[in-house]
Amino acid sequence: MINSLLTRVFGSRNERQLRQLNRIVAKINALEPEIEKLSDEQLQAKTPEFKQRIADGEALDKVLPEAFAVCREAGRRVLGMRHYDVQLIGGMVLHLGKIAEMRTGEGKTLVATLPVYLNALEGKGVHVVTVNDYLARRDAAQMGKLYNWLGLSVGVVYPGMPHSDKREAYASDITYGTNNEFGFDYLRDNMALSKADRYQRGLHYAIVDEVDSILIDEARTPLIISGPADDSPELYIRVNRVVPNLVKQEAEDGEGDFWVDEKGKQVHLSEAGMEHAEQLLVEAGILDGETEGLYAPQNLTVVHHLNAALRAHAIYQRDVDYIVRDGEVVIVDEFTGRTLSGRRWSDGLHQAVEAKEGVPVQRENQTLASITFQNLFRMYKKLSGMTGTADTEAFEFQSIYGLEVVVIPTNRPTIRKDSPDQVFLNRKGKFNAVLADIEECAKRGQPVLVGTTSIETSEMLSEHLAKAGVKHEVLNAKQHDREATIVANAGRPAAVTIATNMAGRGTDIVLGGSLEAEIHELGEDATDAQKAAVKAEWQQRHDAVKAAGGLHIVGTERHESRRIDNQLRGRSGRQGDPGSSRFYLSLEDNLMRIFASDWVQKAMRMMGMKEDDVIEDRLVSRQIEKAQRKVEAHNFDIRKNLLDFDDVNNDQRKVIYAQRDELLDAESVKDNVDGIRDDVIFDIVARFVPPNSIDEQWDLRGLEATLESDFGLQMSLTGLVKEHEELDAEAIAAKVQERVNQHFAEKEAGVGEETMRALEKHVMLTVLDQSWKEHLARMDYLRQGIYLRGYAQKQPKQEYKKEAFELFSDMLENVKREVVTLLSRVRIRSDEEVQALEAAERQQVEARLSQSQFQHQDVGSYSADEEAAQVQAAQQGIAQVQRDEPKIGRNDPCPCGSGKKYKHCHGQLS
């Protein structure tokens, strides 16, 4: 009550911020008459003037009013577009490192030019992050005209571009690219073998377009550079033949072999299912039924493959979660409906889906480097973003990224009419109503955008509309190449466009069609008369569509997130245009089936509702919103959980990457090597000749053997001690240290100082990279099984932190020892050999990168089952308990004398 009273008196925080920013808008507007009088040359001369003032120590905030006024005037002269006052506010919000929520059609691309221009004046680079390559290239080309006119350089990065071009793009004042490409290049830079091989020059300031899509929807997807591992795909194919014979349970305790946890995207075998699976695997020749069971230690790999195959068959659906194109399984993004070419699910899931679909099974991947988008973007010194829908996720933006959301008012009031949801008993009734609505709109010339959540639904609707004779276009992952054309025509009279989630499409639907696209089609030689004729024709269509009610939005299903629904709605009613929207739901929709309360379904059935009966009720709408809030909270927990774990990895990643940077930047690493060598020798000697110990505790022969095997040094310590009985442990350590130093000095004298320095640097980088790669695999294994610690009344996250630290400490010690051992034993005769080594290593890295992929790590519920932990225990060499008595087989008689099999008696799995 007090809060609401204070808000009424002083306004909300958002209103107070807007009032402060409006004062600066007044200053910018006051400068406009003066700036307008400047000639082109005088206006362009402002850029070097601003740069000098900033270099002399003037703060960006002081330069802001004048810089924004200059950018606004340049936009008017070069692009023919003048920034509105609300766009100036949006630009200031972005400059302050916040998120600007701006409705669709409010000109976010133009807004970004203001803070981009201002921050690029520092000369440290500005990254503009988009959701796809098309938008990156389009925005770089369109807005690049403005920046180039103002004297700033613009680059764009995209997959597969030549190295020199990419390096030049990153050296530009402003760089456009996708979140994937910026993240991928960051990881690649940290696999580079020399400074010259790196692309980026630091993460200074980023503006993220569609910030909710990138920082929230994709936050569950770690960005992974992975290369093929050495496993065989044959087992996936053999297990795939077995899985269709297993039967799904309709209820968790019903009959069948397995049940599906749809929330967590996991599959669990029942007791009967384990027996049935074991029997089928024996019949298929995968298991030896006489001597081993499914859960015998040597068969844990089979368990892993079986779980992956079950998930592939029971959870992942073709044309919903993925499509098959050109003999490959391509993931479909659940949020945007786009295909994610090059991305693969991890943990063998992608291979299992390939086996299911009968396409060539590619080898499993090994992680070479990884980072989450959360930790990537938190590394920028300043981060901001813009989107049409951020306010529903304001808490997450603030708690994870420290980003405040500021809602920017629209330039013109929104007059779109949002109708209440209509709820049907089943999908058939729902789609009948959807088709009737579409046909009615088409008859009166009103364009319709139909939003679906899967390719399957979009194609089913397309078939029905084709039968009814309604002309339409389908925009989904399969029509990705025609996207721009389809969207450009979606606002024409009676146009019907069926689209999978429109989130992040980045192109406005203009009533009457895209005038800009039509004029572009005329070509550069078009006369003014031709352009005028096209414009007049477009104006007629524009007026006709407005009269018909503007763009009508039909939602065929509620998405898990309210934000995605709002994005679909936001495609209509842009810049004060008329429009309308309605969502059609059924009790068979995933959201309603999994998350909505059972009483809603019971009540509708008790009321005797039939297929085509519809219910419009606030109570039901509230239940739907409640269900969406549940899912949003569930997904937030998953993302927060992922971040908690990745923060541990991130601390380690920072240490390793800082060491790599130090190595790449250093002219010589001799001091590092000398320090490492002293530490390693001290530890080795202390193991065999402990400090302050007596000679009875010494193992001189063991020390001699280690020195010979690790360093190629022959040193008779037993003879030395016989000759000099007064030698104590410290003296022996000094003698060994002296001999090792002498050995290194002799090696350096033989090859020359310059060659030795190059070799030291090469060996340190190679060992560090290989050890880090192996460490990432160990961290994956640790994380997958860590949740089982909860059963032992231990806190999994704390256990993970503790063991991750121990693994990291061990890795650093191993790096030291490996470096010294390699440098001791390597035989190099010339500098050319070192260069040849580096060239070969560089080729290997490039080969790995050419085969590497964005691995779309599936982190459904981010938990692990017991079998996974057992797999990791076996792989990490954890000691197995030794039995005093023979092991009882699951099919053997129970020792209790009941006459039952052990698995049905005291060996029954709980």
Swiss-Prot record:
EC numbers: 7.4.2.8
PROSITE patterns linked to this entry: SECA, SECA_MOTOR_DEAD
Family according to the record: Belongs to the SecA family.
Species assigned in the record: Stenotrophomonas maltophilia (strain R551-3)
Name assigned to this protein: Protein translocase subunit SecA
Sequence ranges of Basic residues compositional bias: 900-910
Keywords, alphabetical: ATP-binding, Cell inner membrane, Cell membrane, Cytoplasm, Membrane, Metal-binding, Nucleotide-binding, Protein transport, Translocase, Translocation, Transport, Zinc
Any single Gene Ontology cellular-component annotation: cytosol
Membrane topology per record: Peripheral membrane protein
Location of the protein in the cell: Cell inner membrane; Cytoplasm
Superkingdom as given in the UniProt entry: Bacteria
GO terms, molecular function: ATP binding; metal ion binding; protein-exporting ATPase activity
Comp. bias intervals (Basic and acidic residues): 558-568
Function description: Part of the Sec protein translocase complex. Interacts with the SecYEG preprotein conducting channel. Has a central role in coupling the hydrolysis of ATP to the transfer of proteins into and across the cell membrane, serving both as a receptor for the preprotein-SecB complex and as an ATP-driven molecular motor driving the stepwise translocation of polypeptide chains across the membrane.
Catalytic activity entry: ATP + H2O + cellular proteinSide 1 = ADP + phosphate + cellular proteinSide 2
BP term (GO), one: protein transport by the Sec complex
Region described as Disordered: spans on this chain: 558-580, 873-910
Quaternary state and interactors: Monomer and homodimer. Part of the essential Sec protein translocation apparatus which comprises SecA, SecYEG and auxiliary proteins SecDF-YajC and YidC.
HAMAP family found in the cross-reference section: SecA
Annotated cofactor note: May bind 1 zinc ion per subunit.
